[in-house]
Amino acid sequence: ELVAFIWDYYVRHPEFVTILATENLHQGQHARKSQNLKALSGEAVGVLRPIIEAGQAKGLFRDDIDITHAYLMIASLCYFYNSNRHTLSSFLAVDLADKQAKADWLVFISDLALRGLRR
């Protein structure tokens, strides 16, 4: 499942989350200069496109889905938890680094993403 793939990538590569956060602090100045970034973003959205289109062909997913919006929804739900887990753990008095907490969040966001795409 795509949600699990993106989630697992962020969990296994916390350095990537840190790089994204740092790059955003610098207002994307290095990302704008990257020759490879557009190709990478095309691949990320490209992975999602056949999944969405297959779901639409089967009548499972809405016909009005914007692929970019769907990707942003999934990536946002995965990124926010991982990039803010330290402060949110303190704020919510919950250990968001706990294995079960992460598993529960993945189940929740997978369900949420499907609800957003289904007819």
Task: Please describe what each predicted stretch is.
Residues 5-8, 12, 42-61, 73-119:
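C-terminal peripheral helix-coil segments that are non-catalytic and often amphipathic
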Residues 1-2, 32-41:
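Amphipathic alpha-helical linker/stalk segments
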